[in-house]
C-alpha cells in the first residue's frame, strides 16, 4: 500500500480541493413556450432552439 512520505499542509489540501465544488445547472427560457429547461437540451414539450424536434 502507498504511504505518503511527508504530511500535506492545509494549504496544499485546500488547493487540491478547490476544483471539487459543484456548479449550478445552467437554465434557459424557451423562446416559443416560455418553459424553463437545461441548456443544450430539448424541453419537455419537444422544442429545441425554437423548433419542434420531437412529435408526441
UniProtKB/Swiss-Prot annotation:
This protein's record includes keyword Ribonucleoprotein: yes
Origin superkingdom: Bacteria
Keywords linked to the UniProt accession: Ribonucleoprotein, Ribosomal protein
Molecular functions per Gene Ontology: structural constituent of ribosome
A GO cellular component annotation in the UniProt record: large ribosomal subunit
Biased composition (Basic residues): 7-16
Region (Disordered): 1-26
GO biological process, alphabetically ordered: translation
Family (UniProt): Belongs to the bacterial ribosomal protein bL32 family.
Classification via HAMAP family: Ribosomal_bL32 (MF_00340)
This protein's name: Large ribosomal subunit protein bL32
Native species: Shewanella baltica (strain OS155 / ATCC BAA-1091)
Lineage: Bacteria, Pseudomonadati, Pseudomonadota, Gammaproteobacteria, Alteromonadales
